Curated annotation (Swiss-Prot):
Biased composition (Basic residues): 903-917
Protein name: yemanuclein
InterPro entries: HRD (IPR014840), UBN_middle_dom (IPR026947)
Annotated source species: Drosophila melanogaster (Fruit fly)
Compositionally biased intervals (Basic and acidic residues): 408-427, 679-689
Amino acid sequence: MSKGGEHKRVTLTSIIQGDAGFSRFGSNILEPDAASAAPDNSSKPTTKTAKCIRIKLDLFETDSNKYPEFNYSRLLYLEKKKTKKLKQVSTTNGSASTDPFADNDDDVARIVKELEAKYGNSYATGRGKSKKDDYRDIGMGYDESDSFIDNTEAYDEIIPEEAETLEGGFYINCGALEFKNLTKKSYTTRTDAIIKMPERSRKRMVSSSSESSSSSSGDDDENDDGNNEEDDESDSEDDSEENDESDSEDDSESESLEDEDSAATAKSSSKYKDNHQAKRAKVIVTGKSKPSSSSLTSGKKPPTKPITTSSSSNSPRPSTVEISDTEDGQDPIQTQPSSQLQSLPQSQAQAQALKKVVKTTTVKDMLKAKRDSFLKSQSGTAAVKGVGNGELKCVSTDVSSSDSSDMESEHGRADRQAGQHGKDGQENLRTADTLLPTTLDADIVTAVNSFKEAVKSRDMCGKKFNLDVKLSPLLLRVYEAVLCTDRNERNMVFSHIEYQLQLPKYYMLRKGKQVRAKEEKRKSTIMLEKLRRAVAVVMPKAVANYETELRTFAEQAAADVNSELPPKMPRKKFQWTSELRHLLYDVYQARWTSYAFLAKRKESLEEFINWYLKEKVVELWPPGWMRLDELQREITRYKNAKLKAKEKPKAPPASASPKPVGVVSAPEQMPPASSYLKAVEDPRSRGNSDTDSATSASSNSLKRKLKEMPKQTSKPPKKKVAKQVPLQPQLTPHPQFQLAPAATAAVSIPAISNNNNHLPHLDTLLSMPSTSAQAAALNAAAVAAASTVLDLASPSRKIDLNTSNNFYNLITAASLAASGNPSPHSGDGQAKVIVGARPSPHVINLDDYQCTSDILQTSKQLAATTTVITAISKAAQTTSVARESSSESDGVEIVGVFPASKPQKKVQSKPKNKTQNRGRSSLGAVGQVNGSLGYSANNMYIYNSPRTLGPVYDLTDPHIMKTMSNLKEMEKQFIQAAFSPNSVKGASGGMGSSAPSTPTRQ
């Protein structure tokens, strides 16, 4: 390209005759006869190049009957032929050849070169087209509605190998193409139908003339194709009984093809009669023949059918005796004299013999011959058929490898059916009876005999019959019975039936399979109908509810137009019931059991069942109400429920938890007043694993202390104390010990038992002389008090918050009364000595607390409830009180420690819906009010407990705080008096519920 937009001059070279640079168009394009006029003395041979040919095509409009279609090869051939004729005419006339481009050779060559370079392929440009363009749809991505896009050019779209366009050929790019599948399913078992050989051009070995040779070969191919289609049709009719309904279309297509070819085969037979003379074929003649079921050329029904050479392409066929068409059930077996057979037309035999001479051996013929020999060996060697003692006998046949049948095509389809029945009925029949196996069950033998008698009673032996309502159940019984037997026994049973009924064994097996398939379909249909009725009953109510929800939704949507959260659209939700699930599972089970009989080849069980659920079951509901995945989910749910129901009867003996050893030995080792041991052993502590050892150690120490309790009587200690209480005031009318009113009110703990028998207060027992009886009574009262505290602290304790005698009233009204009424017994001259029994251990469930501060606060409050005794006698001051030291601080046994956490402010949270049913102590039933014991209610696992406390007092009240400080001082005095040398002796005798025993200090 020159600068400034100026055009550059180019030198053009003219095309000369000897230049081979433009071999694409030919150096002699302007001189067609140049090659012939070239001198012969040239050493190099002249290269013959192809000429450009101009083809003129006339396009016409496409209508419903025709459309323009051109074959380039044929057009090229016709054009060359036309050019050759014109050349011959011009040569004969002696006129010189005229070249259309003789005037402007250079211009034409230049234009052709430019156009070839611009629009040509790789030959002109020198580079090939990319392979990816071959697999690209050039019409992809264009806007069909755009008028600028030109879609009038025809091009070949990408079409899969297994598909073809609906009408075939090429299309203008307008819309999507419609395809049809080229593959056709076929379940036939015939060898020649499975192995499809391509048709080859066969050469004739003998021919009289070229015209007759061409016509005979064409007729031969037509006759061969017609007979093959006839054989395919006859086998497809037999196989259609065991195939599914989808195969009926294939059979109808083959029938139509066969009827069209019958006329062509009739023409070929007439040509053989008129034009050919050859050797007679060997004909086997016996005394029996099958009557013709259709007329010959005359159209009438003669009593006999001529027998020709026995050449079959399918299987060994008897040439003389055949069973009549029992589908019609009217034609009996008739005989034909041998004299009539001898007078057969010789032209038919000659035609058949000529076929054998003309045909060449192909791979297809060899395969058929091998197949025929195999079938013959399977059926066994046979003798010549004849009539003897009224029984049919087998006959040996001359098997030919020819592809034609015995002129069946000219007699119509009815005659072919009769011949097919004769072949099926006689080729494998038994010559002797087969005894039933002795190992068969009695019900199988009964079913076989019943079926034989039913067939014989109707005189249907040797006839292929259609099963009716009576015969179908009998055959089904036989078929189902032998399915569970050995293969050899099953073959013996059907061989016996074959001989008795004169019907082929495979025919009975096929009929049995058909009956079983129908039975399985009937079961599935019955179950599906039950489900349909149940759904029809439920659906009206479901639809009405859905419509109501829709109206409600419309009202809410209209009311809340500008709301941020619009109401949800109701869904079509079908409510399943146990009955509907059961019916659905019945349909699933019926389909599952029919898989072996109704499934197609290479179809899995899941595909088989899912197809039925999707196509049949889902359609029972209105559109949009049911999906396949929902059906599968309900079936799975029903399966799981069914398995759980089966496992339930076995579960109780296996899953029953054994009773703890401590609970079993409870009547002998521990009193029933304390339920702490059971609470410790049965459920594990919900704390971390580090507290397990502490829990076990504490429980063991408590069990040891409970075992050391005195067994005075078989009755519980509570009842014993109750009996001893009335006797004590009579023995000692003048008490020596007396509790302060405040202390008495503060520490009086009622022992709550199952019988609601309250034990006497400690002030009643302790205001008596210090004798052995007093010590025993004091010990019993202390045991009862300790058991009460343990009972209150146990997780399984059920308390009544409405009663006045409970643990929460310890520091409420009693404390206020004590602080308001000072003790009248305290004087200046009397020294108060606080004595008491050993403190009882209290077990705290650490799972109810989150921090150590709450645990310490609770332990101090429990320690404040220790029995406090005030002594007013001087003699009591010198009495030594023995107190056992314990590892537990203040009578509190810690069985586990949580990591400390920062105390959080109490925030009243919203009530939760759930209530955790964990093991909780009786102390954990406190509501939102931090009442008598000062717990933090957030530590408890109770949210919506209906049990609330009665009127309680706030511990922040100054009056209550003063009372608490007085109690604390009394506790300190009690501890000092207990460890002083002059403490009261004998207070520790008989105590069994205290802390672990240690050496007594005196």
